[in-house]
Swiss-Prot record:
Record site feature (Part of a proton relay during catalysis), residues: 44, 107
Protein name per Swiss-Prot or TrEMBL: 4-hydroxy-tetrahydrodipicolinate synthase
Organism of this sequence: Yersinia enterocolitica serotype O:8 / biotype 1B (strain NCTC 13174 / 8081)
First-tier enzyme category under EC: lyase
Active site: 133 (proton donor/acceptor), 161 (schiff-base intermediate with substrate)
Length: 293
């Protein structure tokens, strides 16, 4: 469940900014039908930063209810205070989530020892499997391979989502982690195939929100070692991988999901603003290049 194409699911909202349950069900049904390996609910792409704690928990619980056992659900549980991350993680004990994706603390920029103690404390507070999430472009904090290797020794820390885009990290982590079962996941669609060719086991994907079947196929081809065919598919998807970030994520992907009829609105909460007209043209061209329009 922690390998293959895992979608970093968008959180659909109605025109008033409330969670759109009907569209959420439609998105979940789409991923079940497409064979997506798992859903990450309320991660970065799910707008965790603009949901309060109760809303955050509610969206994950709604996702669990609507998934109804048909697809595994991973809860996003990161925070920049360890106590807050523990509290949020513990809200999902015994709910049915299969694990938690926990981003490094943001803004306060802890040292490597602080990162180790942060994730160790979270892991020790729960039996839920933990996926570390390293995305320094957003957090201002880079969790280095030696720290990841230390954390990998903790029983319920089972994987890392590496979103630096630095492919050398794959080999660096593999050399340091003495556990063949520890899973390496790419958090960068544009370099995801190369990441898997170096030994990664999947992608936690933004692109999968709107190209779910294609991302499932891409990850399956990589797992089979058929990188020639995987590269042909990836070349078709590359404009999406790149241009879904033409403006801040998840602005473009929510617009694209609405454009494709996957949800009713592309509403965001401030400070996120709607996709601009020039960017719409860029994303539309990418959708056409991928064969989705």
């Amino acid at each position: 469940m922690f390998t293959g194409s895992i979608v970093a699911l968008i959180t659909p909202m109605d025109d008033k900014g409330n969670v759109d349950r009907a569209s959420l069900k439609k998105l979940i049904d789409y991923h079940v039908a497409s064979g997506t390996a798992a859903i990450v609910s309320v991660g970065t792409t799910g707008e965790s930063a603009t949901l309060n704690h109760d809303e955050h928990v509610d969206v994950v619980l709604q996702t669990l209810e609507l998934a109804d056992g048909r697809i595994p659900v991973i809860a996003g549980t990161g925070a920049n205070a360890t106590s807050e991350a523990i509290s949020l993680t513990q809200r999902f004990n015994d709910t049915g989530v299969v694990g938690c994706l926990t981003v490094t603390p943001y803004y306060n920029r802890p040292m490597q020892e602080g990162l180790y103690q942060h994730f160790k404390a979270i892991a020790e507070s729960t039996d839920l499997p933990q996926i570390l999430y390293n995305v320094p472009s957003r957090t201002g904090c880079d969790m280095l391979p030696p720290t990841i290797a230390r954390l990998a020794k903790i029983k319920n820390i089972v994987a890392v989502k590496e979103a630096t885009g630095n492919l050398s990290r794959v080999s660096q982590i593999q050399v340091l982690v003495d556990d063949e079962d520890f899973i390496l996941l790419s958090g960068d669609d544009a370099s995801g195939l190369d990441f898997m060719q170096l030994g990664g086991q999947g992608v936690i994907s933004v692109t999968a929100n709107i190209a779910a079947r294609e991302m499932v196929e891409l990850c399956a081809l990589a797992a089979q070692g058929n990188f020639a065919e995987a590269r042909r598919l990836n070349q078709r998807l590359m404009p999406l991988h790149q241009h879904l970030f033409v403006e801040a994520n998840p602005i473009p992907v929510k617009w694209a999901a609405k454009k494709l009829g996957l949800m009713a609105n592309d509403t965001l909460r401030l400070p996120m603003t709607p996709l601009t007209d020039p960017a719409k043209r860029v994303v539309e061209d990418a959708l056409k290049s991928a064969g989705l329009l």
